[in-house]
């Protein structure tokens, strides 16, 4: 009897293009307001125009790209007021999620967040900002998911997609990056202790400090 053949699944080209184009925008290789040159991006990413255009449309739904009627697309400009409003809401959402997570997160979920935290610490020690940021974003999302409220998690993901570039910019300051790592150490300690009151305060403070750094970075980039 022949063994069942498991199909080899590959990530669709437009999904790969989304990931790579998102990184270019978030990490500043493509600047806010910059027009997207399709020919250059196709060559850089090694893809045709069809998956690139699909990727651009998807990133437009995330708020990272702005579609221009009959003129292509551009990297979405950073708007300080909108960023401030979004991060203010996200601070409240993370505080609520932290409170819920302290009550009901499983041991496996806490262990997973601890593993991500330790990986993030290693990226910080190696001064790998891109790697640090990926771990950082995963930690924030895992804390929200550990709260066990899928509606909260879904809205959080949508909002976070709109501020990825700004959140990355905040840690371009070494002083802010150092402070953010210390804040995450305290957040991890409070979460593992299931100290809801302390964790909610720390998460709110962390997002407030992030907001101040974001607005400072946006002002300098203007």
Language-model-detected regions and their locations in the chain:
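Juxtamembrane/interface motifs at transmembrane-helix termini
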Residues: 53-54, 104-107, 131-133, 152-155, ...
């Amino acid at each position: 009897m022949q063994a069942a053949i498991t199909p080899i699944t590959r990530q669709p080209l437009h999904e790969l293009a989304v990931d790579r184009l998102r990184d270019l925008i978030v990490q500043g290789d493509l600047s806010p307001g910059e027009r997207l040159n399709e020919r250059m991006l196709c060559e850089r990413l090694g893809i045709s125009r069809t998956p690139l255009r699909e990727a651009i449309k998807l990133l437009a739904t995330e708020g990272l790209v702005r579609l221009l009627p009959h003129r292509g697309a551009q990297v979405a400009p950073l708007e300080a007021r909108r960023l401030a409003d979004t991060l203010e809401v996200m601070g409240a959402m993370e505080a609520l999620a932290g409170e819920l997570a302290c009550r009901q997160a499983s041991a496996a979920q806490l262990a997973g967040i601890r593993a991500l935290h330790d990986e993030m610490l290693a990226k910080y020690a190696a001064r790998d900002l891109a790697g640090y940021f990926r771990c950082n974003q995963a930690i924030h999302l895992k804390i929200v998911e550990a709260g066990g409220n899928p509606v909260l998690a879904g809205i959080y993901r949508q909002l976070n997609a709109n501020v990825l570039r700004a959140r990355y910019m905040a840690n371009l300051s070494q002083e802010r990056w150092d402070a953010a790592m210390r804040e995450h150490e305290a957040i991890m300690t409070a979460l593992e202790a299931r100290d809801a009151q302390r964790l909610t305060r720390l998460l709110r403070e962390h997002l407030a400090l992030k907001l101040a750094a974001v607005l400072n970075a946006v002002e300098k980039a203007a």
